[in-house]
């Protein structure tokens, strides 16, 4: 069975049952890999950074000064490895999103193109997390260790991170999570319905093309809202902040569309609320 099938917006007869089973299995495996890696990435960015910090530093340790750290060979090696890992992730994530590369991947894998992208992203994130080099003895940009902030600030950061992750998951669900993870493409293909994006309006398709990272502000809060900021976390935060700023490409038309949709949702909610209140009043009378 070959997955070398081009995705079109036209309705067509679906593939054979064995082909659908194989495609579905591969798509689900890629989804599981992506979902599991995403859950581990939450732990990597939040849990360790708040309650144990990403560098694993211990209370009472005296970190190096910046001048000492720059001359420290171990510190230089750790920072060099971390920067290399970040460049590797960005290279994979950006290269596979390039139009020419996407066309080649689509030519080879067909409807599994998005699933393969998710799998490769998961693998690059796993490499980043597995080989990340902490700098527990490096100079901290800030480190809250005095009472009462040493007790309250981690809790406050935990609250900010929890709300941010909940918002991220909510936005991903709103932005068609199944299509984003490559499952919907296989489902539609097996039903002979073509590309899921072809069934959406041009304005929605345009918005999706510009907003594959609909989590900009929330991720910035997660990256920077930590009780202490060691050098490795600082590099991680700066790198992802710059990358997210470059790929965040909403324009005036996208904002206008989002505003119109929010106004429609609010109007619909207001009508439903008024109808419910009116029905309750009539029932009481």
Curated annotation (Swiss-Prot):
Keywords: Membrane, Nucleus, Transmembrane, Transmembrane helix. The keyword Transmembrane applies. InterPro entries: Nurim-like (IPR033580). Its main location: nucleus. Residues 1-16, 97-113, 181-207, 251-285 are nuclear. Belongs to the nurim family. This is Nurim. The lineage of its organism: Eukaryota, Metazoa, Chordata, Craniata, Vertebrata. The gene is nrm.
């Amino acid at each position: 069975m070959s997955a070398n099938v081009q995705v079109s917006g036209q309705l067509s007869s679906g593939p054979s049952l064995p082909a659908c089973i194989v495609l579905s299995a591969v798509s689900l495996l890629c989804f599981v890999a992506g979902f599991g890696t995403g859950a581990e990435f939450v732990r990597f960015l939040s849990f360790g950074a708040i309650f144990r910090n990403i560098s694993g530093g211990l209370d009472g340790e005296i970190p190096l000064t910046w001048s000492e750290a720059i001359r420290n060979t171990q510190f230089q090696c750790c920072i060099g490895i971390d920067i290399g890992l970040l460049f590797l992730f960005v290279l994979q994530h950006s290269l596979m999103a390039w139009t020419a590369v996407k066309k080649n991947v689509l030519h080879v894998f067909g409807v599994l193109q998005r699933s393969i992208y998710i799998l490769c992203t998961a693998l690059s994130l796993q490499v980043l997390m597995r080989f990340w080099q902490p700098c527990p003895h490096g100079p901290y940009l800030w480190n809250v260790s005095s009472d009462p902030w040493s007790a309250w600030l981690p809790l406050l950061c935990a609250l900010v991170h929890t709300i941010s992750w909940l918002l991220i998951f909510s936005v991903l669900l709103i932005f068609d999570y199944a299509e984003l993870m490559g499952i919907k493409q296989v489902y539609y293909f097996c039903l002979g319905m073509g590309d899921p994006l072809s069934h959406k309006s041009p304005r929605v398709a345009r918005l999706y093309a510009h907003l594959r990272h609909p989590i900009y502000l929330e991720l910035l809060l997660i990256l920077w809202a930590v009780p202490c900021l060691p050098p490795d976390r600082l590099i991680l935060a700066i790198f992802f902040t710059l990358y997210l700023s470059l790929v965040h490409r909403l324009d005036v038309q996208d904002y206008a569309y989002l505003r119109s949709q929010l106004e429609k949702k609010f109007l619909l909610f207001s009508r439903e609320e008024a109808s419910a209140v009116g029905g309750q009043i009539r029932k009481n009378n």
